[in-house]
C-alpha cells in the first residue's frame, strides 16, 4: 500500500461518507414528511 495513495484516498472517503450521510438524512426527512 503506497502512503501517497492513502493520503489521497482518506479525504475522498471522508468526503464521500459525509455526502452520503447528508443525502441519507435528507431522504429520511422527506420520507417522514410524506408519511406524516
From Swiss-Prot:
GO terms for biological process: photosynthesis. It comes from Trieres chinensis (Marine centric diatom). PSII is composed of 1 copy each of membrane proteins PsbA, PsbB, PsbC, PsbD, PsbE, PsbF, PsbH, PsbI, PsbJ, PsbK, PsbL, PsbM, PsbT, PsbX, PsbY, PsbZ, Psb30/Ycf12, at least 3 peripheral proteins of the oxygen-evolving complex and a large number of cofactors. It forms dimeric complexes. Belongs to the PsbY family. It is found in: Plastid, Chloroplast thylakoid membrane. Pfam families: PsbY. The gene is psbY-A. Residues 1-4 are lumenal. Keywords: Chloroplast, Membrane, Photosynthesis, Photosystem II, Plastid, Thylakoid, Transmembrane, Transmembrane helix. GO terms for molecular function: manganese ion binding. It is a single-pass membrane protein. This is Photosystem II reaction center protein Y. It comes from the Eukaryota. InterPro entries: PSII_PsbY (IPR009388). Its main location: plastid. Residues 24-36 are stromal. Loosely associated component of the core of photosystem II (PSII), it is not always seen in crystals. PSII is a light-driven water plastoquinone oxidoreductase, using light energy to abstract electrons from H(2)O, generating a proton gradient subsequently used for ATP formation. One of its GO terms (cellular component) is photosystem II. The chain crosses the membrane at residues 5-23.
Amino acid at each position: 500500500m503506497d502512503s501517497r495513495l492513502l493520503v489521497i484516498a482518506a479525504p475522498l472517503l471522508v468526503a464521500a461518507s459525509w455526502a452520503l450521510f447528508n443525502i441519507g438524512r435528507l431522504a429520511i426527512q422527506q420520507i417522514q414528511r410524506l408519511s406524516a
